[in-house]
């Protein structure tokens, strides 16, 4: 048994990604699967309205293990998604990483005030996501739960 198996449920990790840009969504899904394994389920919402609706449908049994939310959705949608997540009985305790290209201190501060676990810069990098996953205990410090060969 690989020592990393305890970090990977047999069915993979369930990640909820809220991203309106198709290219950024593709990058995020790729990085998530590199770090957490191909068996990881990535649920993608393309806008705040869709995300808030899905958050309202999650239960304790099917909630995501991690949420990644684009802060700069149209109409300040990222903030509404954070608010909905923290107001949801099922999702209130789910680690939530904000991904953003915003350099405004106010945006970053408000993200943390609304319950973000971390704020990561766009485009999402493997190194930054890995560091935060280790920090919250979703990955062992020795490396990723899923190893890919570079040969």
What are these regions (language model features)?
Residues 69-71:
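Active-site residues of response regulator receiver
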Residues 47, 77-80:
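Acidic catalytic/metal-coordinating carboxylates
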Residues 30, 80, 103-118:
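Alpha4 helix (beta4-alpha4-beta5 surface) of REC/receiver domains from two-component response regulators
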Residues 1-16, 22-41, 60, 121, ...:
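Non-catalytic signal-transmission and effector/linker regions of two-component phosphorelay proteins
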Residues 44-66:
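Acidic, metal-coordinating helix/loop segments flanking the phosphotransfer/catalytic sites
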Residues 53, 79-92:
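Short amphipathic alpha-helix used as the core "switch/output" element in two-component signaling
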Residues 12, 38, 62-65, 90-95:
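His-Asp phosphorelay/catalytic-motif detector in bacterial-type signaling
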């Amino acid at each position: 048994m690989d020592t990393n198996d305890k970090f990977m449920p047999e069915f993979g990790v369930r990640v909820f990604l809220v991203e309106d840009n198709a290219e950024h969504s593709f990058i995020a899904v790729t990085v998530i699967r590199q770090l957490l394994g191909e068996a990881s389920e990535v649920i993608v919402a393309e806008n705040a309205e869709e995300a808030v609706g899905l958050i309202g449908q999650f239960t304790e049994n099917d909630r995501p293990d991690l949420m990644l939310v684009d802060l700069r959705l149209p109409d300040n949608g990222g903030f509404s998604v954070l608010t909905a997540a923290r107001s949801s009985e099922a999702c209130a305790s789910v680690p939530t990483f904000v991904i953003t290209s915003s350099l405004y201190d106010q945006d970053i501060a408000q993200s943390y005030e609304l319950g973000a676990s971390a704020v990561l810069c766009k485009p999402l990098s493997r190194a930054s996501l890995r560091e935060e996953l280790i920090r919250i205990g979703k990955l062992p410090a020795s490396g990723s739960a899923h190893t890919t060969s570079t040969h």
